[in-house]
Amino acid sequence: MNPLTSILGTIISGFILAALIVLGLGMSGISVWGVEVWFHVMAGIVWIGLLYYFNFVQVPAVGAALGDEGGPGPAAINKYVAPRALLWFRWSALLTWLTGAATLETMGIGIGNAFMLKEGAAVIGIGAWLGTIMLFNVWVLIWPNQKKILGIVEASADQIAGAKKVALMASRTNTLLSI
C-alpha cells in the first residue's frame, strides 16, 4: 500500500503533505491568491522542467541514437517517451499561463495592465509577455510539428525535415526566454 508505487498515489500524497504543512503551520487563512500562486509555480516547474529535459536530454539523445549505426535508434523514445512528455508539456504550459493570468487579476494588477506594462506592472507584465510567447510556441509551433515528427499525423519526408527545424527553433526560443 505504498503510495509511491504509482504516479497518482505520489501526486495525491504530495497534495496531502502540502495540506498537512499548511495546517501544521497554522495557516488557516488560505487565500485564493496563495492557491493560484502555488498552482502557477507547480505547473511552471513541470513546464520548464520538461522544456529543459527536451533541450538538454532528449534532443541530444535522439541525435546520438540516429548517429549510432547498429544501435537501437530513437524509436522507443519517439514512440513511448516523447508523446507522454509532450502531453504534460503542453497542458502544464496552458495551466501555467491560466494560473498566471488569474493571479494577476486576484492581485489587482489585471492582465490588461500587465500586458500594457502600466506603472507598477511592468516587470510582471514582461513575464506575462514572455509566458504568452512561450505558450504560443508550445501550442502553435512545437506541438503541431512534433505530431509530424513522431508520426502522429501523416507527413512527407520534406514536411518532417521542416517540422524538425521549426520545433527545434521554437523550443530553443522558449529555453532562451525561460532564462
Predicted regions and their residues:
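Polytopic transmembrane helical bundles with strong interfacial aromatic enrichment
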Residues: 1-179
